[in-house]
Amino acid sequence: MKTKQISIALPVTGENEWQAVREPIMSGWLTQGPKVAEFEKQFAKRHKANHALAVTSCTTGLHLILEALELGPGDEVILPAFTWVATANVVLYCGAKPVFVDVCSKTFNIDPTKIAEKVSSKTKAIIPVHLFGLCADMNAIKAAIPDHVKVVEDAACAAGANYQGRWAGTLGDAASFSFHPRKSITTGEGGMITTNDRELAEHM
């Protein structure tokens, strides 16, 4: 029996994208050139963030954020049980422990009503995932955690997403976006960190 592979999503590209790629190639400036700085500036502006830092992937961005927040062995990080494995991997990269919380059956985002029971004296951060571009219930999430717990948005799928009049990427202490081909915008691979915390941005 023949089987047909069904893609999660296909990137939409055309003449505009070709010209955008062609310009830096023809200039000879393929990495860390003026186009990167321009992209960071425009991405920050679009999401109303004070700082945007281009990275190689959303995973790299999440890892950088956790390192900048100085997470390490003995620390715990709360995250949803339904997410891409990278969300948990970056916690392990830092030597910290991922603590999983079940998700809502309607949104597939982390269930705020189940967070408080997973908070301990070792909890240093929470990583809400804005799954499939739908922002997690950030108000309820923040109400469920102590004030000292850092909020790191896994906004891999959430470029341009909005939550109660605020943009994804500005709903916590920092966020990381993905530009993988199945995301709403793509650079082939790549990612972006956003934050309104100047000191944190400089540390990264």
Where are these regions (language model features)?
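N-terminal "arm"/small-domain region of PLP-dependent enzymes with the aminotransferase-like
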Residues: 1-30, 34
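Phosphate-binding glycine-rich loop
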Residues: 29-76, 87-94, 100-102, 166
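PLP-dependent aminotransferase-like
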Residues: 67-155, 162
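Conserved active-site segment immediately N-terminal to the catalytic lysine
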Residues: 150-186
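Conserved core segment of the aminotransferase class I/II
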Residues: 181, 185-204
